[in-house]
Amino acid sequence: MRRLEWKFMKRALILTKGRNYSMNASIEMMRNIGVVAHIDAGKTTLTERLLFLSGELRRMGDVDSGSTVTDFLEVERERGITVQSAIVSLPWKEHRINLIDTPGHVDFGVEVQRCVRVLDGLLVVLDGSAGVQAQTLTVWRQAAKYSLPSLFLVNKMDKPQADFAMSISSIEDKLGLRALPVVIPFSRETALEGFIDLVEGRCLKLSKGKNSEWMTIETKSCEFDVFSEGKENMCFGLSDSDQSFSSLFLDKYQGDTSKVSREDITQALRRVSLSRSACVVSSGSALRSASSVRPCLDLICNLLPSPVNSSKLVKESIGNHFSGLLFKIIHDKRRGRIGYTRVYSGELKGGSHLWNWTRGEKEGPIELFEAQSDSLDPIKSAKEGSIVAVRGLEKSLTGDAFIALDCDKRSFPEEDPASHIVFDG
């Protein structure tokens, strides 16, 4: 069997079919998130685990064997590193999450910069034995330019050298942020035992291997003391970062953590995440236990913003007409030149012509595809907030802005619509 035929057959065996579960999700239920990290922090393995947990994959691939969904180039599979960004979509509790897995090597920083421009939030992955590293700092500066809310995952906590406290300190010292741990590791002597979710009041024990599942922490369990101390630290940290929560927790509840509800904590965590007044930190070991990174999916949906605000900014200028930004161009072996585009307002329809506002040229007719890494599925239209693959933009370049042909050409914002977005709850 020819190599190309085997590639597509293998992909069909791995990816699940019938992905209409959340493709029609409202804009409020969308999340456009980038996964960023320094090289070898476990970013691609994390993405693979999230796809599996969501039901998008029948089985998980492995970076070392070259079988992951998002590292599909030959050089990526051979070297075990991400060279170019890959886009995947997955469902989680009525939400549609569009994830962009970005390169972690400093040599491909431009690729990351192009993607950050069209995102609404970031999931920053740290190696638990190294904390914040060079590429982490670079990406953080880019995120600050667009005021992107961010979550952190301290990964690889099963490594002998892993140090969660050191990783937290590196976030606060190098990025100048207050770190709020919400999923913490717990150990027996020096061995990692599992993880505790301080928001949900549950724990995951790694001793049960691949069958490990999150279980509610009982008051008589040996994990309860670790949970109680961790929740208290989290609540006092939140009080220092959010005035509303401070009034509730310190004044109304007199610092009693048992009176604070999950909803109280989640709403406060969302406020500090959107305002970037603090950063929420989870922990896990994506390679050893897929379940350990399950809280990341809940945190993405509960704490990070939808595309509503960025769409609202553009609509103030051009109403409900289509507008979009081309942020990545690839050459697909089967379909030729493909442009990845973020839809900021209106609806993008297959077969239509567009006006390249940046260059003053007409483009089209276009074909639309939903991208799942290197797999492109034809679709008829894409609504605002979507990230979509477009064929037919033959004269356009990365960074070009598009509007509908019937839109007033003078009304498009002079500045990049992502430049001055302020997120609210």
Predicted regions and their residues:
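Structural and coupling elements of P-loop NTPases
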Residues: 2-425
